[in-house]
Amino acid sequence: MTLSNSALGKKSTYKDTYDPTLLFKIPRIDNRKELGIVNDKLPFHGVDIWNAYELSWLDKKGKPCVAIFTFFVPTTSSHIVESKSVKLYLNSFNNFVVDSMEELKRTILQDLSNNTHAEVTGEIFPINTKIEFGSPTGINIDDIDIECSEYGPPNNSLIKHEDVLVEEELNSNLLKSNCLVTGQPDWGTIIIKYKGKKLKHDALLKYLVSFRNCNEFAEQCAERIFTDIKNAINPEFLSIYIIYTRRGGIDICPYRSTDSNYTLPSSKRLIRQ
């Protein structure tokens, strides 16, 4: 089944019975080809961090339970799962009786692993779990006075650099693109760490703004930005982390790094999450 003839982007009927066939998988290679990326020789390491805030089920006595579910899809997976299909799938547990939270976790992770063709890991957190908030690390470039006229498609020729080597961390809250399926806006905060030729901050901001009317999945936007910066400055080190705001009770936060021994970014939520 393709995106065009799937139920995605159309009016949906929510099922109240557990149904793993609701998950809709999409090959990563379809979007990576355009970027010159092949799955067996990835130029990055990393993970897609998903936070699902609307998980609910029934316990053995029929009492509703609610929780937050965080899971991690490795970049080495051959497929991703479309976010609306994940929402529909998770909602199919709403009237489903589960013996324990651990059993529920095993079921969901197995279904996600089956669809992504990779080992998906994750945890279910009680709704009363204490959550820490933070702010983006690094230098914020949003207040630079620039004129913008390009809002899509993304224009990598806007990236400029200086012939001086630096190690720095930059962030912007102005990243926006649109969902490839629904056309709804995806708002994101991006954190860029690198060691190499100094990126011109004003030019980088113009480049990020050029995603504004772009229709791509969150994962593809992250890989496009990573690839474009890598091709522009050939850095010794580069990492990209995009924290998207939630839509439909789910947020997706892609992380890409040249370091195979990367550590996951801080789990602190930003104010827009």
Curated annotation (Swiss-Prot):
Name of encoding gene: queF
Binding residue positions for substrate: V81, E82, S83, A218, E219
NCBIfam families: QueF
Record protein name field: NADPH-dependent 7-cyano-7-deazaguanine reductase
Classification via InterPro entries: GTP-CH-I_C/QueF, NADPH_dep_7-cyano-7-deazaG_red, QueF, QueF_N, QueF_type2
GO terms for MF: preQ1 synthase activity
Function recorded in the entry: Catalyzes the NADPH-dependent reduction of 7-cyano-7-deazaguanine (preQ0) to 7-aminomethyl-7-deazaguanine (preQ1).
Reaction(s) catalysed by this chain's protein: 7-aminomethyl-7-carbaguanine + 2 NADP(+) = 7-cyano-7-deazaguanine + 2 NADPH + 3 H(+)
Lineage: Bacteria, Pseudomonadati, Pseudomonadota, Alphaproteobacteria, Rickettsiales
